[in-house]
Amino acid sequence: MLNSIKLSAIVHATEDEDKVLEAIEFFIPENVDEEKIDLDVVETQGYFGNPIKIINVNVEGKEAKKIFKHIIDLIKSDDKNINKLKKDLHLRVEDNKFYVRFDKQKAYLGECRVVDGDDIIRAVFNFKIFTPKNKEEKVKEIVANELGF
């Protein structure tokens, strides 16, 4: 049912790009074929004209499923994450996509923390849903089942 995953993060001028990449890599298990990972770094400007980079990681197919399982396991390792997602899952699903933000600093330190803030790693899980109606309900059902609630 999972089609693809996109992980993205902003690297501010005051941050080390390698450390942000390490934080993103925390969400990618070692058994994923690196050749199946599409990594893109875009240099641009922030709202106030400050230089920033946007790191995008796209993965499809079987490798995306491995990452999804890994991220689900990371989320389940902390009850705070589960409680937060239980409370606001309806806000995190649109069409056939499930959106989650993770604390970028915590990820660098090897911790998974679901947050709503700005200094984040954004994950977008794109599901193949074949029914024309109730796509969002189907995605919520899949995610809730995976997370055990």
UniProtKB/Swiss-Prot annotation:
Which InterPro entries does the record associate with it? PAB1135-like, Ribosomal_uL5_dom_sf
Q: Which domain of life is it from?
A: Archaea
Q: Matching PANTHER family, A to Z?
A: EXOSOME SUBUNIT, EXOSOME SUBUNIT, DUF54 FAMILY-RELATED
Q: What is this protein called?
A: Uncharacterized protein MJ0213
The organism is Methanocaldococcus jannaschii (strain ATCC 43067 / DSM 2661 / JAL-1 / JCM 10045 / NBRC 100440)
